[in-house]
Structures are given as C-alpha cells and as structure tokens.
C-alpha cells in the first residue's frame, strides 16, 4: 500500500509540473510582416513640369522599388478601392482642367428657327452616293486629301439657324440675336410658316449646365499613386490574371506604375499596360470586359480639325456672355484616321476571347464580330467619344468597323468627327456646356492600347463584341492588378514564457537597411524565422515612416504655393499625417498593454484558445493573423485588464517600498496621514465620552436622581460601599459608626466609566462565544468532508520525508564511500612515496654491502 501511495504522489507531482510547464501565455510581437485591406486616400506624383498637372500632384522622384514575395493574395479589379479612387481622382483632374464654372441659365426662350439641311451640298451628295458602294479607302501621311483637307466622307451635321430676342444691357429694350445649333440639341414645334419653327434648348432648365470660364487644354498627363507611410501596394504578378484571382502571386511596391489620364469611350489611348500580347480583364459577375491590345501591331489614331474658325460672343444680360459660332459648310468638324495592323489585331482579340476560361460561346471566329450600340443610345455610346486638346470629338465609326470586319459597304480607315459644346458627363449623370472650339488648326496623336466592350452571346451561333462607353473600365485595366493594404505590425501568439521570467538571449542578426519596403521582405518566411528579425523590422518600419514623411514634407514645402487652392493639394497634405498618426496609435496601444517600445513582449495573460497554436516552422505571420483575427478583441481586452491590475500592484508596492529609505521616516508629509488619523481617533473618543455622559445623565433623570442640579459640594459626596456584607468585627451602634476601613468612597462620576466598559465587555464576550460556537459547528460539519482531503497532503508529506531520507541516505553512503576511497588512496600514495624516498637509502646500503 505504501508503494501505491508513493506512485500516486509522484504521478501528482509530474502532472502538476507538466500543467504548469505546458501552459501558454499571450505574447505580443511588434514588427511582424502582416497586413489587411485598406481604403485610405492616396496621393499622386508626376514628372510633368509644364502643364496643369504640376499643381495637382507632387513631383515624381522615380523611386520605383519592387520586392518579390513568396505568398498569395486575392485580387479583384472591380471590387477594388484603388480603381474606384482612380476614377474619382481622374474626374477631379478632368474637371480642374476644363471645368465649367459659370451657370448657364439664359437662352431658355422661344427661338424662331429656319432649318438649313446641309445634305443639299455637293460634298454630302457625293458622300451619300459613295455609301452605296463597297469601295475601300485607306489614308496615310502622304495622302493628298490630308494636305488639302478634302477627304471624302466627312459627314455634315444637320444645323438650324435661329433668331431670338433677349434683354441686353438695356433692360427696357430687347435685342435680336442669331445663333446656330445642332438639330439634336433643340426641341422644335411647327410654326405658322412652312420654313419656320419654334425651338427651345433641350437642357435650358438643367441647373448643372454650365459654361466654361476660359478655354483650357487637356494635355496628356501621366501620374502614379503613392501609398502613405505605414501602407503598401501589392501587385499581382501572374500573367494569367484576368481581373479576378483568389490566389495570386504578387510583389510589394512603393507606388503604382505610371497611369494615363486619357478619357474616351470605345478605345483606351496611351495606356501603360500594353504588352506584346492580347489579354482580357473580365468582370467576375457579368459580361463587362476591358481588352488590352497587342502592342506588336502599332495601333494608332491621328485626329485633325481644319482651321479658319471664328467665335462670336453674345451678351445676353449684363455681365454674362454666351459664345456662339457662325454657320458655315463644316461647322465644328474634324476627322481621325487609324494606322497599324487593325485586322490582325482584332483577329487576335477574337482568338483570345475564344480561349478565355469565362467564355462559353461559339468557337467559330467568323461568328465573333465587333459591333456597335443602337442609334437610340447616348452620343457617347453611339459614337466614339474622346478629348483632343480640350475639344470633345464624337466620331462615327461605321466606316471603320466595315474596314476592320471586312463587311459590305464603304470601308475606310478613318472616321468623321464632330465637336460638341453640350457634353454628357462620364462620371456622374449630368451635362456640361463648354465654349465653342478655338480658332486655328487642331490635331492630336494617340496610341490605341485597349478596347472597352461587353461580350454577349445568346447561343453557340453568334457572339457580339459590343463596344462600351464605360470610361471607368480604363482604370480597371490600368490599376486592377494592384491593391492597397495597411501594415498591421502588432501580432499575438502563444508562448510558454511568462512576463518577468528569464529568457535565453537570442543571437543577433545583422540589420540590412532595405528602406520601408524591406519591412515586408520576410512576409513569405515562417513565423519563427520572421520573429528573429523583429528588432530590425520595427526599426525599418519607423525609419521608413520617417524617411517618407521627410520626403513628403520636402516636396510639399516646394509646392506649397501651387498647392494652396487645389483639392489634390489638400489630399497630399492629408496623406502626410496619416502614417505618423498610425504609428502613434500603435505605440499607444502597446503602451496600454505595458509593451511600449518592445519588439517581443511576454505577458501574464493566459492564451485564450489552447487548441489554436501556430506552426512556427511552416506558417507565415499573414496566415496566422487570418486564423486569430477573431480573437483580437478578446485578447486586447484581457491585456488591458492585466495591465491595469499590474499598475495597481506596482502602485501598492511602491507605497510599501518608500519606507525602505531611512530619510523617508523623517519626511513630515509621510506622517501627516498618521497624525490626521490620530486626531480623528482622539476626537472620536471625546465625542463618545460626551455621548455616554449624556445617555447616563438622561437615565438617572428618569430614575429621579439629579446630581447635576445639586449644590457644588454634592459633587464630592461619598457613596458608602461595603467591603464585607457579613457581620462587622467590632460591635458598635449605628450612631457610633464603625470601622472606616470597612468602606470605600467612590465619586459618582466613576460609574459613567464603568457603564461603557461593562457594555463593551458584555459585547465582546457575546461575540467571542458566538464565533466560537459558529466555528465549532462549522468544524463539526466539515469534519467528514475534510477527512478524505487530509490523505493527499499526508501522502505528499510522507513522500517528501521519504525522498529526503533517501537523499540523506545516499549522501551518507556517498560520503562513506568517498572517505574509504580517500583513506585507501592516501595509504597507497604514502607507501609509494615511502618506497620512492627509500631508493637512495637502498642504493647506499647496496653499495656498502658491495664494498664490504
């Protein structure tokens, strides 16, 4: 039985030791390579120095660094805060460049108009006749019609010449005005005469219609986005990426590639994503696509507007002008021709669509065709809409599509275009009114890099590549392979180390300064390897933040005059303080846990989920953070509570430690609390005596005894107290008195002291007896329960004593063995030394015997 008890005792000891050693605590790591999706404002940088872009963006320092990461991330070009932000920002740049700024409320009057159809001209007749033919006309730089401005097929718009009366500078007199309008911009009613109609402007009552203050140029501008310090940009580096990929290899970059701000429908111009291949970004839920065209085919577009234009101002009311243009044969017209191998480029687009995993239509290339929208659509959808040097061109692409698709009918590699003043906004619903085209020749050249289209197929027989007017799709292609993330350098993980326990120092590694991007260089490493470099990581993070802050401050200082009144200037200044706020927020959070300025901070908080533990050798910090993100709120609360309790304990400890210093005993401020307490006790005793005196006096008054109102000698009257109630020893009469030693005299005030003492004594006796009875009853009740609990401690004491006796016996045996071995060794050594010492004597004795 004793052996069983010993085994049980040893088992309990091992279990308790294992339970203590196997317990994990929350450890806070600062500087881990982890992140989460973000949607903060970005700021832009550009190389332009001579355009309006310099007042919108900061100067570009050409710092484009890229680091490959061995991890995966989900990307979606359409569910992307960066592309949405780019759409809004480009619209802001667009509005800043050619923004209408004067409300156009006049001209909401009845106008008498004469319809002047331009189809009666010779050119239009020739053009109409040519529409019925199927000839092919191709232009190049050497074509004579380009130099003479006589290329056939430039259609003429239907124009209406109108007259109206409005009050001018003299409010009591009306003035007659003349103006020329496009037919589609007016709503007309039949007049009294056959050639006369009553017309109104369609959009005269729309409050958002405005007139431009001044004529501006819309120059080509390229800029790139930059992430504020504390944030990073991830780019999908997979050639199979098509706008959506849940697992994509990626890299970390400090800022985006250059992005083009060109706005247009149908085609994208001067894009930065053109490669030596054709690829498609396809929306994850519908048929919206943006197709990047192969740069091998050198697809370009050249637009030209003939000169000799005249703009006439019309003063409608005092201080407000409306600019008009006299009617002529070709009002507000231009034309664009296309160069490059368009036929093979569109053929490659069809092949790419056929091989795309999202496509399930016909595989016959001849049944996949490039189509346009119906004629009832908006002008920006029905025509190719683009901006050329600040003018809005609407180009009829019918001849061009016939040429590319090799259809029947007139085939031309150029399109006729018209310049409009009333333009539908592409970012929001509304219209703007701009000045008429400037005088002189207008031309612009662009590289065609993408095609905006909806791919529709109903069955396996026909597929339409319908060109689209979604301008925002251009920025899905430009920036759809990026995503913005916020660096989350604070992480939690369970370790067996508790706060204030000794830790084996780690070998320090050399710090390689990689800049801010080097912070994420270990994102693909295992947690154990990444945690070894947390000191370097956190220093790199702070150094990168400070460096980027300094660079941003420098460029803002250089541009502060230009940035004073711009919206983008405000955004750039806002980005300056984003990172430092984030860093201070992280440090404040670490400070609330008692981990300020520590890379690895062990705590006393037990790990909340023992079944969830990291694989330090195979798991990255990003993977671990995804698993424990739902525990962050609980862990944060526990850490804050533990830190509050720790601060309370430290405060109490400091209060006790202050008496360790001998000089503190003579500090008057240290004794003030005790002096105050002593005064309170004295005052309490005095008040208690007064209260007892009053109570005693009232009690005596109720009995009819009133010593208070007696004469002063009554205060000293004696109260006889018998010493012995038996018969007095001396027989004396009552008159003669007796032995004075048999009585004691007490002042009556003493009884006031005896009364509270007796009451206090009775109260203490009652409390003592009650507590003793309660403890006795409790002990008797718990006796059966405590009896089994005495055995384990008894076994433990027995085991400890047995273990001590065994150790003592082993020590005695070892001591005796060592002593015996020492005595034996000493004897052997002594005999050996004696023999060695006797050698000379033996030699001498031998020599003497030999001589004898």
Swiss-Prot record:
InterPro entries: Gp120_core_sf (IPR036377), GP41-like (IPR000328), HIV1_Gp120 (IPR000777). The keyword Amino-acid biosynthesis does not apply. Residues 510-530 are annotated as: Fusion peptide. Residues 1-24 form the signal peptide. A motif (YXXV motif) lies at residues 705-708. The gene is env. This is Envelope glycoprotein gp160. Residues 461-467 are annotated as: V5. It comes from Human immunodeficiency virus type 2 subtype B (isolate EHO) (HIV-2). Residues 713-740 are annotated as: Disordered. Residues 162-204 are annotated as: V2. Residues 699-852 are cytoplasmic. Residues 573-589 are annotated as: Immunosuppression.
């Amino acid at each position: 039985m004793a052996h069983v008890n010993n085994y049980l005792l040893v088992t309990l000891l091992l279990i308790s030791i294992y339970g203590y050693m196997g317990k994990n605590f929350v450890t806070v790591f600062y500087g881990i390579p982890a992140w989460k999706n973000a949607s903060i404002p970005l700021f832009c940088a550009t190389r332009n120095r001579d355009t309006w872009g310099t007042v919108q963006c900061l100067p570009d320092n050409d710092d484009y660094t890229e680091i490959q990461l061995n991890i995966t991330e989900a990307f979606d070009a359409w569910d992307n805060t960066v592309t949405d932000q780019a759409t809004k920002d480009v619209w802001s740049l667009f509005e800043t460049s050619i923004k209408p700024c004067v409300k156009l409320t006049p001209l909401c009057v009845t106008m008498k108009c004469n319809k002047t159809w331009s189809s009666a001209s010779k050119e239009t007749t020739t053009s109409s006749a040519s529409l019925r033919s199927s000839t092919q006309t191709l232009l190049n730089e050497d074509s004579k019609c380009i130099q003479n401005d006589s290329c056939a097929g430039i259609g003429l718009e239907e124009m209406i010449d109108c007259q109206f009366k409005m009050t001018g500078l003299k409010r009591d007199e009306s003035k007659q005005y003349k103006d020329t309008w496009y037919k589609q911009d007016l709503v007309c009613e039949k007049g009294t005469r056959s050639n006369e109609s009553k017309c109104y402007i369609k959009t005269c009552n729309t409050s958002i219609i405005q007139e431009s203050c001044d004529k501006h140029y819309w120059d080509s501008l390229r800029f790139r986005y930059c992430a504020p310090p504390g944030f990073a940009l991830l780019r999908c580096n997979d050639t199979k990426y098509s706008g959506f990929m849940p697992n994509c290899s990626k890299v970390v970059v400090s800022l985006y590639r250059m992005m083009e701000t060109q706005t247009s429908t149908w085609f994208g111009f001067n894009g930065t994503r053109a490669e030596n291949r054709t690829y498609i970004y396809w929306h994850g839920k519908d048929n919206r696509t943006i197709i990047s065209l192969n740069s091998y085919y050198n697809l370009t577009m050249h637009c030209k507007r003939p000169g000799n234009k005249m703009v006439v101002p019309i003063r409608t009311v005092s201080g407000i002008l409306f600019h008009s243009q006299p009617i002529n044969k070709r009002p507000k017209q231009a034309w664009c021709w296309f160069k490059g191998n368009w036929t093979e480029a569109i053929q490659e687009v069809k092949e790419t669509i056929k091989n795309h995993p999202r496509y399930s239509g016909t595989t016959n290339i001849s049944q996949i065709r490039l189509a346009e929208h119906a004629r009832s659509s908006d002008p920006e959808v029905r025509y190719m809409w683009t901006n050329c040097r600040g003018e809005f061109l609407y180009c009829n692409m019918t001849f061009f599509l016939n040429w590319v698709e090799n259809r029947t009918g007139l085939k031309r590699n150029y399109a006729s275009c018209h310049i409009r003043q009333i333009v539908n906004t592409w970012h929001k619903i509304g219209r703007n009114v701009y000045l008429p085209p400037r005088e002189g020749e207008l031309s612009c050249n662009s590289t065609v890099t993408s095609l905006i289209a909806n791919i529709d197929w109903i069955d396996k027989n026909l597929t339409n590549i319908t060109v689209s007017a979604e301008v925002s799709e251009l920025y899905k292609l430009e920036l759809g392979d990026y995503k913005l993330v916020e660096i989350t350098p604070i992480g939690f993980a369970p370790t067996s180390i508790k706060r204030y326990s000794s830790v084996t120092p780690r070998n320090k590694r050399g710090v390689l300064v990689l800049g801010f991007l080097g912070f994420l260089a270990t994102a693909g490493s295992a947690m154990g390897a990444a945690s070894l470099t947390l000191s370097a990581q956190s220093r790199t993070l702070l150094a990168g933040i400070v460096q980027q802050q300094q660079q941003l401050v420098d460029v803002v200082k250089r541009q502060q005059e230009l940035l004073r009144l711009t919206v983008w200037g405000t955004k750039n200044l806002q980005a300056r303080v984003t990172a430092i706020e984030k860093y201070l927020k992280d440090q404040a959070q670490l400070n609330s846990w008692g981990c300020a300025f520590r890379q690895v901070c062990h705590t006393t908080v037990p790990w909340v989920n023992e079944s969830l533990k990291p694989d330090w050798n195979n798991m990255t910090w990003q993977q671990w953070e995804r698993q424990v993100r739902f525990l962050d709120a609980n862990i944060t609360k526990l850490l804050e509570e533990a830190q509050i309790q720790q601060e309370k304990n430290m405060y109490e400890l400091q209060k006790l430690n202050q008496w360790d210093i001998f000089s503190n005993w003579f500090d008057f401020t240290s004794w003030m609390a005790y002096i105050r307490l002593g005064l309170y006790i004295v005052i309490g005793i005095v008040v208690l005596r007064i209260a007892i005196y009053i109570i005693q006096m009232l009690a005596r008054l109720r009995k009819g005894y009133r010593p208070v109102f007696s004469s002063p000698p009554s205060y000293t009257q004696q109260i006889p107290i018998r010493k012995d109630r038996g018969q007095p020893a001396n027989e004396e009469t009552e008159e003669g008195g007796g032995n004075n030693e048999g009585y004691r005299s007490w002042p009556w005030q003493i009884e006031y002291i005896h009364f509270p003492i007796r009451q206090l004594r009775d109260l203490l006796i009652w409390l003592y007896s009650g507590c003793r009875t309660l403890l006795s009853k409790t002990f008797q009740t718990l006796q059966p329960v405590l009896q089994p609990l005495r055995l384990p401690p008894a076994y433990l004491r027995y085991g400890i004593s047995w273990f001590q006796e065994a150790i003592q016996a082993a020590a005695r045996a070892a001591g005796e063995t060592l002593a015996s071995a020492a005595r034996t060794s000493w004897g052997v050594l002594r005999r050996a030394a004696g023999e060695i010492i006797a050698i000379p004597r033996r030699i001498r004795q031998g020599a003497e015997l030999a001589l004898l």
